[in-house]
Protein backbone atom coordinates (compact mmCIF):
# COMPACT_ATOMS: atom_id res chain seq x y z
CA UNK A 1 0.00 0.00 0.00
CA UNK A 2 1.51 3.31 -1.04
CA UNK A 3 0.56 5.05 2.20
CA UNK A 4 1.89 2.36 4.55
CA UNK A 5 4.74 3.00 6.98
CA UNK A 6 8.18 2.21 5.57
CA UNK A 7 10.40 3.74 8.26
CA UNK A 8 9.78 4.35 11.94
CA UNK A 9 11.94 6.92 13.72
CA UNK A 10 11.85 6.51 17.51
CA UNK A 11 13.10 9.14 19.97
CA UNK A 12 15.81 7.68 22.17
CA UNK A 13 13.96 8.77 25.33
CA UNK A 14 11.02 6.43 24.59
CA UNK A 15 12.87 3.59 22.85
CA UNK A 16 13.34 1.40 25.95
CA UNK A 17 9.67 1.65 26.87
CA UNK A 18 8.17 1.53 23.37
CA UNK A 19 10.28 -0.74 21.19
CA UNK A 20 10.20 -4.14 22.98
CA UNK A 21 6.42 -4.55 22.77
CA UNK A 22 6.14 -2.89 19.36
CA UNK A 23 8.84 -5.15 17.91
CA UNK A 24 7.25 -8.28 19.37
CA UNK A 25 3.86 -7.33 17.93
CA UNK A 26 5.38 -6.71 14.50
CA UNK A 27 7.41 -9.93 14.51
CA UNK A 28 4.26 -11.85 15.51
CA UNK A 29 2.48 -10.28 12.52
CA UNK A 30 5.22 -11.52 10.19
CA UNK A 31 6.95 -8.19 9.64
CA UNK A 32 10.65 -8.20 8.78
CA UNK A 33 12.44 -5.46 10.72
CA UNK A 34 15.58 -3.67 9.57
CA UNK A 35 17.24 -1.44 12.12
CA UNK A 36 20.08 0.88 12.94
CA UNK A 37 22.80 -0.37 15.27
CA UNK A 38 20.93 0.89 18.37
CA UNK A 39 17.68 -0.74 17.27
CA UNK A 40 19.40 -4.08 16.64
CA UNK A 41 20.31 -4.29 20.33
CA UNK A 42 16.61 -4.77 21.18
CA UNK A 43 16.15 -8.08 19.35
CA UNK A 44 18.41 -10.54 17.53
CA UNK A 45 15.81 -10.92 14.76
CA UNK A 46 16.37 -7.34 13.61
CA UNK A 47 18.41 -7.22 10.43
CA UNK A 48 20.97 -4.47 9.88
CA UNK A 49 19.47 -1.62 7.88
CA UNK A 50 21.42 -0.54 4.83
CA UNK A 51 21.51 2.87 3.21
CA UNK A 52 19.12 1.45 0.62
CA UNK A 53 16.61 0.37 3.28
CA UNK A 54 16.08 3.93 4.48
CA UNK A 55 15.08 4.97 0.95
CA UNK A 56 13.01 1.90 0.03
CA UNK A 57 9.25 1.92 -0.36
CA UNK A 58 8.79 -1.76 0.49
CA UNK A 59 5.12 -2.34 -0.33
CA UNK A 60 5.49 -5.45 1.83
CA UNK A 61 5.60 -6.57 5.46
CA UNK A 62 8.94 -4.85 6.02
CA UNK A 63 9.85 -1.91 8.21
CA UNK A 64 13.04 0.03 8.88
CA UNK A 65 13.45 1.35 12.44
CA UNK A 66 15.92 4.02 13.51
CA UNK A 67 16.45 5.52 16.96
CA UNK A 68 17.05 9.28 16.82
CA UNK A 69 18.47 11.73 19.38
CA UNK A 70 16.00 14.52 18.72
CA UNK A 71 13.63 16.18 16.28
CA UNK A 72 16.53 17.70 14.34
CA UNK A 73 17.93 14.26 13.56
CA UNK A 74 14.48 12.98 12.60
CA UNK A 75 13.88 15.95 10.28
CA UNK A 76 17.28 15.47 8.64
CA UNK A 77 16.56 11.78 8.07
CA UNK A 78 13.16 12.56 6.54
CA UNK A 79 14.62 15.31 4.34
CA UNK A 80 17.17 12.84 2.98
CA UNK A 81 15.04 9.73 2.50
CA UNK A 82 11.38 10.78 2.25
CA UNK A 83 9.26 9.91 -0.78
CA UNK A 84 7.51 13.27 -0.20
CA UNK A 85 4.20 11.37 -0.09
CA UNK A 86 3.04 11.28 3.54
CA UNK A 87 4.93 11.85 6.79
CA UNK A 88 3.69 11.64 10.36
CA UNK A 89 4.78 12.54 13.88
CA UNK A 90 3.28 10.98 16.99
CA UNK A 91 3.89 13.32 19.90
CA UNK A 92 2.40 15.07 22.91
CA UNK A 93 4.59 18.12 22.25
CA UNK A 94 2.56 20.45 20.04
CA UNK A 95 5.52 22.79 19.53
CA UNK A 96 7.42 19.89 17.95
CA UNK A 97 4.30 18.95 15.98
CA UNK A 98 3.98 22.45 14.50
CA UNK A 99 7.67 22.52 13.64
CA UNK A 100 7.38 19.09 12.01
CA UNK A 101 4.45 20.25 9.88
CA UNK A 102 6.28 23.43 8.87
CA UNK A 103 9.59 21.79 7.98
CA UNK A 104 8.68 18.44 6.43
CA UNK A 105 8.35 18.53 2.65
CA UNK A 106 5.57 16.06 1.85
CA UNK A 107 2.23 16.15 0.07
CA UNK A 108 0.49 15.36 3.38
CA UNK A 109 1.96 15.88 6.86
CA UNK A 110 0.16 14.29 9.80
CA UNK A 111 0.24 14.83 13.56
CA UNK A 112 -1.03 11.94 15.67
CA UNK A 113 -3.01 10.37 12.81
CA UNK A 114 -2.48 7.47 10.46
CA UNK A 115 -0.88 8.10 7.07
CA UNK A 116 -3.38 5.60 5.69
CA UNK A 117 -5.78 8.55 5.38
CA UNK A 118 -3.79 9.79 2.36
CA UNK A 119 -6.39 8.80 -0.17
CA UNK A 120 -8.47 10.76 -2.65
CA UNK A 121 -11.75 9.35 -1.36
CA UNK A 122 -10.84 10.14 2.26
CA UNK A 123 -10.00 13.71 1.24
CA UNK A 124 -13.34 14.10 -0.51
CA UNK A 125 -11.92 14.06 -4.05
CA UNK A 126 -13.82 10.98 -5.21
CA UNK A 127 -12.10 8.00 -6.76
CA UNK A 128 -8.35 8.41 -6.53
CA UNK A 129 -6.28 8.11 -9.67
CA UNK A 130 -2.89 8.76 -8.13
CA UNK A 131 -0.82 10.71 -5.63
CA UNK A 132 1.47 13.53 -6.68
CA UNK A 133 4.51 14.47 -4.67
CA UNK A 134 5.37 17.39 -6.96
CA UNK A 135 4.89 21.00 -5.91
CA UNK A 136 3.50 22.28 -9.21
CA UNK A 137 -0.08 21.68 -10.27
CA UNK A 138 -1.73 18.98 -8.14
CA UNK A 139 -0.04 17.74 -4.97
CA UNK A 140 -1.29 14.92 -2.81
CA UNK A 141 -4.23 12.66 -3.65
CA UNK A 142 -5.56 13.29 -7.15
CA UNK A 143 -8.86 12.55 -8.84
CA UNK A 144 -10.03 13.35 -12.37
CA UNK A 145 -10.24 17.17 -11.96
CA UNK A 146 -6.55 17.34 -10.97
CA UNK A 147 -5.58 15.56 -14.20
CA UNK A 148 -7.49 17.86 -16.49
CA UNK A 149 -6.40 21.12 -18.03
CA UNK A 150 -8.29 24.09 -19.36
CA UNK A 151 -8.74 25.23 -22.89
CA UNK A 152 -10.24 28.67 -23.34
CA UNK A 153 -12.24 29.34 -26.51
CA UNK A 154 -12.52 33.06 -27.24
CA UNK A 155 -14.51 34.44 -30.16
CA UNK A 156 -14.68 38.12 -30.88
CA UNK A 157 -15.61 40.74 -33.44
CA UNK A 158 -12.32 42.58 -33.57
CA UNK A 159 -12.20 43.67 -29.92
CA UNK A 160 -8.90 45.01 -28.67
CA UNK A 161 -7.49 45.62 -25.27
CA UNK A 162 -6.57 49.19 -24.55
Residue ranges and their predicted role:
Residues 9-114:
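NAD(P)-dependent aldehyde/semialdehyde dehydrogenase
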Residues 3, 20, 142-145:
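Residues on a specific face of well-ordered alpha-helices
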